[in-house]
């Protein structure tokens, strides 16, 4: 049997948000999730994920995927940094791209933190409150995350 991301899913929106420690991420809601056909639960938790990724400059975009394993332990995975245009010219304007949802093994993707840097941004150090958008995974990952 082949396991795919549809077998490791988050069953409810976690309500991802900036944590009390402003450079971290929390869940506002309790969630259920599955890994390899088994169901697990995680209570709403503050300071759950400490983002890690590349230091970014203004005009760069990166996604940090937020995972839980069967023990409820949090981990992260950063995408490659992509460039976004800062031009206002309609003829040179950047056409947005997309990040595909990951296909994790032995863990569940609870959501993503999309960073669109308007200035220097260091994951795990810079507050997630200003340059980040949280995307909650649900029963079906659906369309790629666009930027």
Please place each PLM-identified region on the residue numbering.
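Beta-strand-rich solenoidal segments
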Residues: 1-147
């Amino acid at each position: 049997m082949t396991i795919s991301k549809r077998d490791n899913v988050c069953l409810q929106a976690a309500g991802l948000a900036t944590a009390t420690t402003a450079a971290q991420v929390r869940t506002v809601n309790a969630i259920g999730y599955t890994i390899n056909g088994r169901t697990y639960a995680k209570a709403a938790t503050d300071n759950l994920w400490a983002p890690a990724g590349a230091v970014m400059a203004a005009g760069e975009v990166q996604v940090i995927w937020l995972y839980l394993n069967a023990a409820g332990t949090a981990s992260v995975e950063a995408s490659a940094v992509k460039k976004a245009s800062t031009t206002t010219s309609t003829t040179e304007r950047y056409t947005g791209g997309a990040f595909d949802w990951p296909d994790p093994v032995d863990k569940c993707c609870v959501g993503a933190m999309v960073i669109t840097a308007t200035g220097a941004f260091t994951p795990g150090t810079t507050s997630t409150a200003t340059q980040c958008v949280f995307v909650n995974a649900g029963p079906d990952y659906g369309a790629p995350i666009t930027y």
